[in-house]
Amino acid sequence: MLRDKYGVDVNFKLVYPLAIREPEFFEGKNFFTYFWWKMIDMKLKARRLGLPFSLPPKPDPICQNTFTGEVLKDQPFIFDICHFLQAIEHDKQLDFAYEISRCIFGGTEDWHKDNNLIEVTNKLGLDFQSIKNKAAEKEEEIISQIKKNQKEQLEAGHHGVPLSVYKDKFFFGQDKFNDLVKELKKDGLNI
């Protein structure tokens, strides 16, 4: 909205999900004490925003035991999709993140399969095969970029996502988006 409607420069920076960056965060959290409430919250927010939302994702990008909180060692999906996204030209990364999130959490089965990724990249005018090749060929560079983004995220003051940073302030979560807009208005954004 801010970028497309008001010309705000959004510098999207991909980080690995918290379960990958800080698996210990989920120790002792389980379906009944944590995940159940998160799912209810996400479903309500999606409904309020008019977004498609279906749980669980098929497959879930993070392999995790929701009854114990344990993040599994084997992660067959999250690194591939993160590296694929990071291989996309920077000005299209946010668009891809938006579209693939709609697939993952909107009920698209096998969102990670090439045919679904091709559909998303085609929609955005991107070349699936060249992105896939770049993700494979430049994997170490991509991992370094993501780690740099994670370092900058922590330096901004928070480890969560979504995180917006403007000047010296961070805005964590969808609920803080309106606070970010207020700050932009103070600096002259005409909405």
Kindly label every feature range from the protein language model.
Residues M1-V8, H90, D95-I191:
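C-terminal cap of thioredoxin/glutaredoxin-like
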Residues M1-I104:
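Structural alpha/beta surface segment adjacent to cysteine/selenocysteine redox centers
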